[in-house]
């Protein structure tokens, strides 16, 4: 049996402001730093240790990983960063307040943009300052690989090849792996691992800063999964994520 731990980064500054973030490189909020620290403490208390870690190229995930590894006294382990683990690209919605967007377009439309599998938000133009092609961290990507917007399927289509080519062989080799990523890149991975339907993935929320453990068989098929937190805390934090797209705003 293998175990892999998935962790959504701690609350970011734009999570705090209830804004669509996507590939925008915002940092952790003070609460997010504390969530990351608590994740590290929880993993340490439960006896978890890691041989290597995978994360995105966005600082909210990278910093969460740094803090967790610091708590575990494992800052020396290899860390592999890939744009393929980035958050879903929210196109022209990036930077907009979710509650204000819900007022303008309706809560149902915002829920579809945020949660559906195959609907893309309005796209960026290539001359928009937010276009990732202007960012040096994506200099090695082809124009076709750089998104102007993404739905969840698009996100899955970049996450899963990285899982299959790089992360899965690492797990199969016997290494203990930690993946620190984002709400939608992790939703995509969970959909793949658990073979979830469109409706099931639309209702799935992954809370910030709570380790999610997957126990996998030798073929990396899930045996079971669980959060390292009590059910009430998980429920409360999932509801926070769900309520971000509502007209009431932050809740």
Curated annotation (Swiss-Prot):
Belongs to the phosphoglycerate mutase family. BPG-dependent PGAM subfamily. The keyword Nucleotide-binding does not apply. The record marks 182 as: Transition state stabilizer. Catalyzes the interconversion of 2-phosphoglycerate and 3-phosphoglycerate. SUPFAM superfamilies: Phosphoglycerate mutase-like. Pathway: Carbohydrate degradation; glycolysis; pyruvate from D-glyceraldehyde 3-phosphate: step 3/5. Keywords: Gluconeogenesis, Glycolysis, Isomerase. Substrate binds at residues 8-15, 21-22, 60, 87-90, 98, 114-115, 183-184. This is 2,3-bisphosphoglycerate-dependent phosphoglycerate mutase. It comes from the Bacteria. GO terms for biological process: gluconeogenesis; glycolytic process. Coiled coil: none annotated. GO terms for molecular function: phosphoglycerate mutase activity. The active site is at residues 9, 87. It holds the Pfam family His_Phos_1. Its EC number is 5.4.2.11. It catalyses: (2R)-2-phosphoglycerate = (2R)-3-phosphoglycerate. The keyword Glycoprotein does not apply.
